[in-house]
Amino acid sequence: MSIIFHLDLDTFFVSVERIIDPALSGKPVIVGAKPEDGRGVVAACSYEARWYGLHSAMPIKQAYRLCPNGVYLHGTHGEYSRYSKAVKHILEQYAPQIEQASVDEFYMDFTGTKHIYGSMYMFAKKLQKEIIDKLSLPCSIGIGSNKTIAKICSDYAKPEGITYVLPGMEKEFLAPLPVETIPGVGKVMLQNLHQKGIYKIGDITKLSENYFLAAFGKYGSALWKKANGEGKEYLNPPHKRKSISKEKTYGKDENNRVRIEATLFKLTGEVCQLLRNKNWQTATVSIKLRYSDFVTLTRAKTIKPTDDDKTIFETAVKLLHKADTRRVSIRLIGIHLTKFSEFCEQEEIFEDEETIRKKMFRAVTKIRDKYGYSAIQLGRILIDKSNKGTRYLR
């Protein structure tokens, strides 16, 4: 029988922000956007903020109406990536196989390791304590015979708990839980189930698989199996990303093309950081523009494989100028990289400017990985925080 762990870092973004600024502890903290931005949604919020009815994906304006005294933050995304990697590094010391589901979620397969770690529950407590002691990050851990059970268990354990469902006890554990507890049950499916008088997971198990197959097709069959405690007992192998992209939606539609280029410069730096972390080069650069009237344009160009910020940014700017032919304010801008190949560093007897620059960018990447993305800012155009003007750096 498989033994699958699901580790979920509790209110991860908030936890990292509290490490950066301990004064935030005990306060309602909302990460995602600030009320004055106009647009944006809640990416994460503390348990103190949830007492006011806030939740992820809530529009920031609505969140502010419910919790005007909360602390609203854009988020320190470079730090989130750094702490996520640090957690994964700890887990890799123990888990034979890991599947990272998101920046704050990890599946681990500990099948066949009881003779090494003993009690799985006590081992989970040890793992939980090590992450707290070394990184100050609270987490919840679910343990079950498959991924679905482990995921539900970690949600059940929040905050900072551990839930272990022994093999053979899955149906009994699931029966009293609301049907929306099953991963993948969204609003539409929930409404359909309620219309059929199905409110608890146990209600699903009282009916046949064929009933759900007829009502909802293959998804209905999968739902029935999950309700009966069945699920994937193996983890997905790491997959190679097919693209790297970053986008920025403006709080207010932007018509200053200098500021738009400055945004593109920042986004280029972020995607190139990810590119070098993978030790890849890109051969296709794309940009995306969405105007205030929601007309969306994309442009792409194939280039010689590179991981050089300057080359990629210059390509992106040319694409921007080709795409931006309308005298309309811009709502969103994004950059997209595809067609990857492995980076192979070659020793050069005589180093040209591009080679020196590439080495500099790789050094910058290492520093940002260690101290956070904002540790080093590369200058081209800096927009002051009040958006009243521009400063050019040489």
Annotate each predicted stretch with a short phrase.
Residues H6, T181, M189-I330:
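DNA-contacting surface of Y-family translesion DNA polymerases
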Residues M1-A222, L235, Q273, E354-R394:
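Gly/Gly-Pro- and Ser/Thr-rich, intrinsically disordered tail segments characteristic of DNA damage-repair
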Residues F106-G112, T298-K301, E345-F350:
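Short, hydrophobic beta-strand segments
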Residues P305-R394:
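Acidic, metal-coordinating catalytic segment for phosphate/diphosphate chemistry
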Residues A101-E105, G144-K147, W280-T284, V328-L332:
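Short Gly/Ser/Thr- and Asp/Glu-enriched loop/turn motifs at secondary-structure junctions
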